[in-house]
Each structure stands twice: as structure tokens, then as C-alpha cells.
Amino acid sequence: MGFSSGKSTKKKPLLFDIRLKNVDNDVILLKGPPNEAPSVLLSGCIVLSINEPMQIKSISLRLYGKIQIDVPLERPQDASSSSLSSSPPKIRKYNKVFYNYAWDNVNLKEYLSGLRGQSGLAGSSSSSNILGTRQRAQSTSSLKSLKGSSSPSSCTLDKGNYDFPFSAILPGSLPESVESLPNCFVTYSMESVIERSKNYSDLICRKNIRVLRTISPAAVELSETVCVDNSWPDKVDYSISVPNKAVAIGSATPINISIVPLSKGLKLGSIKVVLFENYQYCDPFPPVISENRQVTELNLEDPLNESSGEFNGNGCFVNNPFFQPDHSFQDKWEIDTILQIPNSLSNCVQDCDVRSNIKVRHKLKFFIILINPDGHKSELRASLPIQLFISPFVALSIKPLSSSNLYSLFSTTNQKDENSSQEEEEEYLFSRSASVTGLELLADMRSGGSVPTISDLMTPPNYEMHVYDRLYSGSFTRTAVETSGTCTPLGSECSTVEDQQQDLEDLRIRLTKIRNQRDNLGLPPSASSAAASRSLSPLLNVPAPEDGTERILPQSALGPNSGSVPGVHSNVSPVLLSRSPAPSVSAHEVLPVPSGLNYPETQNLNKVPSYGKAMKYDIIGEDLPPSYPCAIQNVQPRKPSRVHSRNSSTTLSSSIPTSFHSSSFMSSTASPISIINGSRSSSSGVSLNTLNELTSKTSNNPSSNSMKRSPTRRRATSLAGFMGGFLSKGNKR
């Protein structure tokens, strides 16, 4: 975010941005071909935050699409010859705005009057969080222009946060964005302009968005098989097929190659599969420029071995026992492989037709080497057309647009964004949708691993293999529990106390066997897990080794069904059975780490994201949770005061609460003592005259330290006088 100064360096808003709702990374997704795709809703708000009053005339917003084509005027051979010279190649630029949608200007008077009616202030807000302010216009469909009047008047916005909502219906026939093709681009941008008074320059906020198109789940291309069958006379009969014509960018597609040799002694050599991208572009004038670029390739040096699997004990292949290692003559060669499509939109573009200017298609080309009996090599070539499309179920990486969230002024040119100096990292599209299929998808995408095919992501599960499911016999078996983890429904339901004890007993037996095997083999002890074994021994009832021998639980010790999947080999190293603290591990010891963990990726968690990245992820919702200050306030109950009791010969015990020991009570109890006449004794054996004298001395000597220091004695004296007066009245009666 950057502002350039005009006539005044003041009056710059703290925030001026365009925010879209219900979109992922500012991507508008169209579903279906242009003639069948439904319309989509585009909604959002213009966010403005100012720290001082600002006078503005109008706020406008528009969405426009732009196509840019650079047509070279020289042929490739001429360009190569001219590259030797210092003169740059000649090109013809073609720029055109093919789509423009403008919203009505915000009626500021109605907006401010609505705010005054709600809060009595012209948009002022005490909250500094923009997400917490709920200041919205009265209507988004009937916004009137302020520029129509002869003398446009300005309105004053007080200090605070503002958001101006907008919405529009976009047609489904919009051309899609194209960014990574050389010499041709299709981009969409939103532009908001705040027109201010003549003393200040206008403010402009631009935000680039992407319009991407995907195919509908009912499209024929998702289930259409592409196949090429042909024959090379006296050589081979071949068949190459792909199960789905439409392949999502970032996914994988299986490839089947079937070759029948027609001559004896013919051997199969290497196979190369290349994905080519053909794109054509032109401006309104001829000619049409057609170019190709390679997207990815797959090399199979030994296709029979690589496609058939591993060797078994008999020297044959597991998946196809008819294949022999010497590549002798067979009746048929079957090769099944998988081609991984790059997950970056910077390397390839989806199949598209943008107006009559840009056309993109993709094709798979196969190069198969055949080794003849005399030793010379022949090459078989074939091609298959496929369709690449963008799927919201697969996360894609793309380079961010440089002009995103660009702030500029009308009076200035060649502005530079402050964030442009920073290194541009690739951002990921549809990362939220991909998280539904599992976090492993993003991890495999970053590490270059395989990604599930699009048919696995878009189609419902296939139940034709249900005949191999294990039937429930009505009795509880240990096999069903062992094949299910503790976090699965089966493991959580059947994991009783007896089962856990049985599991611990089995684990204790296996650990004992492992220890005996290590002792018999004479393995050297390790000084790493003495404390680890001791911490685990009380639970498993396994005696802790005294020599500090390290105990490792291999896969074989856990049983055949302990977390392993048939046909899948685990790359995870053995894990120490240890819960000891870090200080118990020596400094020179390296603990085994699972190969799937990628610790350098965790370094990104320490980086503070930029404003653009932070706003693209709705971790914090628009509505903040309510606060409950009364409920969370820690109110400590008051402790009641203690009243001490003295001997009855001097004072009387009292149980009166502290709150009632006030001066008013003492003054009211002193009056009966003044009306006492005569010398009478109370039931307690205390002379009433003595009490009167004591009371009079206390009243005449206010500086008595003894009475000041003992308020309990003063209260007891008053109480005694009250009781003496009461007794004297009774005697008179």
C-alpha cells in the first residue's frame, strides 16, 4: 500500500481497499462453457478508514477486462539473425478494454443521513477494528450519481471507519483470465475513485481479480476415453489410451500403452511422453501466430520393469509374472504409468478460446523406441489430444499480480508499490477447497509428490469392489480391531479397558522378544534410551535395561496389520518408543525422523504475512464475538470480620455483626445510662453506679488511649449500660 503526495501530504486515509466476499483469493469461478455457464454474483465493499475529517465529492467503482497482445513483426529466423545485432525486435502492440461495468456513484447524502439516524454521528466510530464496524449504506441497487448536478457539493466524513457495499451479476460468458502465455494477456481489474475537492488530488484504488472457468461435473469430457489404435506393418500393433479426456491442472492422469510385436526378436526400448501446449494469438490484423511449448515430460528408460513392479522370489515380476528380466519375446507388452501435470499456472494454461484473439490447446505426444533384431532402433510416434482445465478441488500456484492493491493519484505517473520491492512469492488458489480432501494434498503439491486424479476428486466413490469387503460374522474378532486405528469409529467403539490391557500385553511380549533378539545377536548398546525405557517399563511391565540399550519397535514386531496397507510400502523410519524429556537425549545423537516431514516448511509460520495475504484468508470472521465483562470479572467475596469474646467479669460477649457497630448505635445505647438513678446491681454482679461512672469518665476524657484502642470494650460498656437501665425499669415496676 503506497500513497503519493499531491498538493498536500495530509488528508491521506489510513486504509482504502476493495474487498470481495465469497471468493477464494479474488477468483471468480465460472462453471461450464461460455454458452451454458450460469451468471455469478460479485459482491463486496469499499473499505475506507480515516483519522481526520475528509471532504469528498463522490465515490465511484468499475470493473473492466483488458486484453493485451504483442505481435512480433519478424519471423523466427529473422528474429534470430537480428538478435545478433543490438536493435530490439519489432512488435505491434494491441490493447483493448473488452468489458466494462460501472456501478452508480455512492449517494453520500443518503449514506450519511442513514448513519446520523442510527448513531447521531456522521460516520464516526470508536472502534479501530474495521471488521467490528457495521456502517453500511441503505441500498446498493438505487445508488444515484452526484456528478449529474451542475454544482456538485462535497460531503464531510468524520474520523472513523466506513464500508460501502456493492453487488453485481456477472454474465457466465465472460472470457477467462490468461496470464502466463508469452506476448498475450487477459486481465480483470476493479478500480475505485474517491473524488475530492480541488485542493487535494483524487485517490484511486485498483485491485486485480481473476476470472477462471471450470467444467461442470456432468461434462462428457470427464468420462470420455481418448484412444489411438494403429499398426506399423511388420513391426507392431499398438494402442494408447487415456481414461479421461479432461485432465485437471495439478492432478495426474493414468496412461495405458499396449504393444503387440509382429516380428520375432523385436525388443522394446525407452518410452518418452511429452505434454505440449499449442497457443495461437493474433490482433485484428493478420497473420495468426502459432507457437508451441513443452509443459512436462515423462521418461521410461526400462518401461517393462518400471511399469510391472517389483521382483518376487521366483525372479518374475509381481504385477505381471509373464514378464521376464531378459526382455525376451512376449506376445504383448503392457505399460501402465501415470503422468503428473504441473500444479503451477505459470507453466501451463487451461484450454480456452478468448474472443477471436487467443486459442490454447494441449496434446500428448509419445515417442517409443523399438530395437530391431539387427540392433538398429526405430521410433514410433503417436499423439493424443487432451483438455486441461482448472478444478476448484486442486490447489494451484501462481505468481501474484504486481498491480494488486495499487494506490495512485491522478496527477502522478509511474507509481511504484511499496510491496513491489519485496520478493514475490507464489500464492495458492483454491487452497481452502483442497483442504477438504486432506492436508496431504498441499504437502504433496509442495514437495512434488503425486496428486490424486481428478476422477477421484469429482466422482462419487466406486462400489464395484464391495465383493472383497469382509463380512461381519456376529462375533468379535481381534483382526477387525487390529486393522482399525484408535481414531477410527471401529477403534473408538471397540477400544474397551480389556482390549487396551490385551494390547499392552501383546506389546510387552513383542518388546521382550526384541530384547532377546538383540541380546542374542550381540548388538552394541546405545547410550540414548535408558531413561526412555525406564519411563515406559512401568506401563508395559518390561524390565528396564541397565546398559542403556535402545529399544526400537520395527514394523515386523507390531504384527502384519499394524497400520500397514497391502501394496503400499512405508518410507517412515522406526520411531523410538520414548516419552522421556529432551535432556535425556545426548547431544551427539540424531533421532530418526519420518521422511514425510518437511521442517523447512515450518519456517514460513514465523513470517508475518502481508496485508494482501492476510485479507485473503478469513480466519477471523466479519462479526467479532460479543464480550462479557460482567461474566469474566473476577469478583472476590468479602471475608466476614471476626468478633472476639472476652471474659464475662470484664466485658460481655457479643455476636453483633460489624456493620451494625456504628456511632449511631452507640449514641442510642448511651441514653439509658444517663437516666439511671440509685445504686442497683445487675444480674451479672456489676454495679450500675460503677457503669455510670465508667461511662461518664469515658465521655469526659475523650483522649483516653485505652478506650480508643479497644472499641470492643466500648461496645461492651454501652451494652452493659443498656441492660442496667432495663433492669432498673423492671425493679421499679
Curated annotation (Swiss-Prot):
Molecular function in Gene Ontology: protein-macromolecule adaptor activity; ubiquitin protein ligase binding
Motif PY-motif: chain residues: 460-463, 625-628
GO BP annotation list: cellular response to pheromone; conjugation with cellular fusion; positive regulation of receptor internalization; ubiquitin-dependent endocytosis
Disordered: annotated segments: 518-566, 636-658, 693-733
Signal peptide range in chain numbering: none
Ranges of biased composition (kind: Low complexity): 523-540, 646-658
GO cellular component terms attached to this protein's record: cytoplasm; cytosol; plasma membrane
Assembly: Interacts with RSP5 via its 2 PY-motifs.
Function: Involved in resistance to GST substrate o-dinitrobenzene (o-DNB).
Protein family per UniProt: Belongs to the arrestin family.
Domain notes: The PY-motifs are required for the interaction with RSP5 ubiquitin-ligase.
Name listed for the protein in its UniProt record: Protein ROG3
Species, as recorded: Saccharomyces cerevisiae (strain ATCC 204508 / S288c)
Lineage start: Eukaryota, Fungi, Dikarya, Ascomycota, Saccharomycotina
